[in-house]
Amino acid sequence: LGAKMAMQRALNSAGLRAGDIDYINLHGTATRSNDASEGKAVADVFGNRVACSSTKGWTGHLLGAAGITEAIIAMLAVEHGFVPGSVNTQHLDPAISIDYRIENSQAEVRRVLSNSFGFGGSNSSLVLGRKT
């Protein structure tokens, strides 16, 4: 519930709807508990039409620096027009109904939602993008 609320509040704060987001940088810790709950929350808010990936496989879990690192990657996706793939993903859970990308791909990315869900329920979602 906390992840879903964080994403909805980020959209509301930015004056956007779910359809305005082109890419979601998932918190994506590669644990069953986190990935299943985050995947369900993303599906509830966005359905399965928004490209999603986790970039923690590139950097490892940087704890307190994870959020800013993922925000930088999100802005690079906007600047360079790509969706970063999730490295080291071996199989996808068919119960998680989102558009999860394992390969880098070119795309027009105007707005990104970046999730950071901390220990003990500290949930944050940040909307980043081009000024329109």
Describe the residue ranges of each PLM region.
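Conserved "HGTGT" condensation-loop signature of ketosynthase/thiolase-family condensing enzymes
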Residues: 1-132
